[in-house]
């Protein structure tokens, strides 16, 4: 009988929770802004973890600058993570910007524009029929 979740999925979920707590409470860097961890992918041997993040950038901050600031803290975050979780080997962490939220908003805006354009065309064609 197979397990509902594989060990790598359970470790990824735990890493996501712990990393969120570490970033929220222990990493103090004004360059980061508000960081959200959207997903964590762990390799099968649990040696590497890809952490996908999004940022709420304020002022002159860009996602690229926030990601660069976060990458400066990778070693320190890994050390804190090692103290919080019990694994034989703490995964090497790599942060990646997750643009799915931005792409989703862009797609939503495109759909809204098309719907509004269609409504406008229907109104215009309805007026032409009346004349």
Swiss-Prot record:
Lineage: Bacteria, Pseudomonadati, Pseudomonadota, Gammaproteobacteria, Vibrionales
GO cellular component: cytosol
Protein name according to UniProt: Ribosome-binding factor A
GO molecular function: ribosomal small subunit binding
Organism of provenance: Vibrio parahaemolyticus serotype O3:K6 (strain RIMD 2210633)
Positions of disulphide bridges: none
Gene Ontology process terms (BP): maturation of SSU-rRNA
Cytoplasm among keywords: yes
UniProt keyword Cytoplasm present: yes
